[in-house]
Amino acid sequence: VAGFSLHGVLHVESSVIALAAAVIMLVIGKQSFEKTVMDVEWPTIIFFTALFIVVGGMVETGVIERLADVVMDVTGGAPVMTMMIILWVSALLSATLDNIPFVATMIPLIQSMGDQGMDVMPLWWALSLGACLGGNGTLIGASANVVLSGISEKNGYPVTYMQFLKVGFPMMIMSIVLCSIYMLIRYA
């Protein structure tokens, strides 16, 4: 915990601190190395590695950035329409892709809209709510969902993609509808 608190002062990435802590725990821990390696959630780690590779490719090839450009073309710069498009597009994409590259792509877009005089506060909220709540729609939409699936399966209670989708997607849609109503009342 101290390492994470001091990583900025120490100029060490938090991933290095986490890895160092894991190695220390492995060395001083009472569990055998083999048991520890067997307890690692390898399918989840491999899944996220592959997901970040695919999403990274989409970012590098400009697919996500082109999608953001399409959103701007569709809305014509109208603030309320832009807010709703950002909310719904970020929710739907976050249900199927990792939301971090999408959010990272949308940040400069929203900043440039602010530079042009548009009130960006509603757009930040739309992006945040859409990206966060959209992850509830599918099993791969959020890291926690994938971890849940792995742990659940390991304990004899597998959750399939379709089982999760039947519950998660309607809940996501209801959440985004409620967010839309709130944001229209608050910002329109």
Question: Which sequence ranges carry the predicted segments?
Answer:
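Hydrophobic transmembrane alpha-helices of multi-pass small-molecule transporters
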Residues: 1-69, 167-188
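Generic intrinsically disordered, low-complexity segments enriched for polar/acidic and small residues
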Residues: 44, 49, 99, 158-161
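Alpha-helical transmembrane segments of multi-pass small-molecule/ion transporters
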Residues: 128, 143, 162, 182-184, ...
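Membrane-interfacial helix-loop connectors
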Residues: 41, 56-157
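Alpha-helical transmembrane segments of multi-pass membrane proteins, especially transporters
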Residues: 14, 18-22, 48, 52, ...
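Interfacial loop-to-transmembrane junctions
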Residues: 150-174
